[in-house]
Amino acid sequence: MKTRKNIYFKVVALAAIAIAFAMPAKAQLSDNGYANIDWQFNAPLSNNFADKASGWGMNFEGGYFVTPNIGLGLFLNYHSNHEYVGRETFQMGAGEVTTDQQHTIFQLPFGAAARYQWNRGGAFQPYVSAKLGAEYAKIRSNFSMLEARENSWGFYASPEVGINVFPWVYGPGLHFALYYSYGTNKADVLHYSVDGLSNFGCRLGLSF
């Protein structure tokens, strides 16, 4: 697990540095474009399979302001939530199994985003946004040397409120956001059923 965490944070750091050097050396993009890359913290709401909050996620978004305040763009993010289930006996096929389990839900939504942003060009730029698209989810249980899983597709919707802060004349700014998301994904794994994936979380990253 420690090695996995180290790899994750190295990937995040390298991605952030790469984007920072690829962007123009201004506090914001020189035209009407915008972009942000974020670390993501996620707390699942009532999915009864893997409902432990985690910081195993990232968010990517970019777009273009079609008016002075309205921006349209694309997004993609991913997240993994995990939960350990203690030793129990349950039915599997024609027999019974007694074991502990490691549950995981991996979510990968992507699609279109729209935002309304205030004070463009200023140091503090609050906004509200909505994301709509599709969500791929992998719901799995690992136990003993076995794995039970189901892949699911669903519709995804997510309102968001956030702020971009540009404290420097040059370089990228800071991005902070709170969001709620809901996916219509459904799955049946072993004796568990998942009917919809809802989450509340926050994002912290770089804004361009």
Regions found by a protein language model. Give the residues of each.
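Residues that define the transmembrane beta-barrel architecture of outer-membrane proteins
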Residues: D31-G33, K52-W56, T104-F110, F124, ...
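A general secondary-structure boundary signal
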Residues: K2, T67-G71, H79, Q107, ...
